[in-house]
Amino acid sequence: MSETSYLTDPRVMETVLRRLDELESREAITGLMVDYMAATDAKEDKGIKVARLFTEDGSWESVGPHGNPGWAATGHEALIKKFDRNVARMPFSAHFVTNPAIDLDGDVARGRFMYFQACTYRGDQPLWIAGSYDNDFRRVDGKWLISYMRVHNFFTTPFDQGWVKVPHMDTP
């Protein structure tokens, strides 16, 4: 097969387009999780910012030995309520997401991520929180959204001399 015919072969183009879609989908899903982290750290309109990242029927659930079934939420209205009540509980939070592992199957995907969070609980209690996400994603009208988020909390632990008592430490 000549180079010219190879480049114009529809099978080659189909393979290239499929691979491009996979790369773009992985990047979009990773970006979606970064957007989720930023939304959960928002001081205003937190619930709306989080809910818009989920499908209309999207669910959030806390699972595992440290899970809290009372925090489960399904649908935009429930997600907004759930995340808006976090503003008073945690007036400061900084979420970080790492280690994406994404499996794609057309317009659905499964993604696993690790997270770390520094936060202030109930006004003056500094905490470290870490865990993982095991999420289902669905592409709706060309946009990837979270359809089911499972949050597995590894630990929530006080940090005795955290950012509340020492807001900034010089590190020359």
Predicted regions and their residues:
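Active-site micro-motifs of SAM-dependent methyltransferase domains
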Residues: 38, 60, 151
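A beta-strand edge to alpha-helix "cap/lid" segment located at domain peripheries
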Residues: 2-17, 88-172
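Short, low-complexity N-terminal intrinsically disordered segments enriched in polar/charged residues
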Residues: 1-42, 46-48, 52, 56
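A solvent-exposed, acidic/Ser-Thr-rich amphipathic alpha-helical stretch
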Residues: 46-115
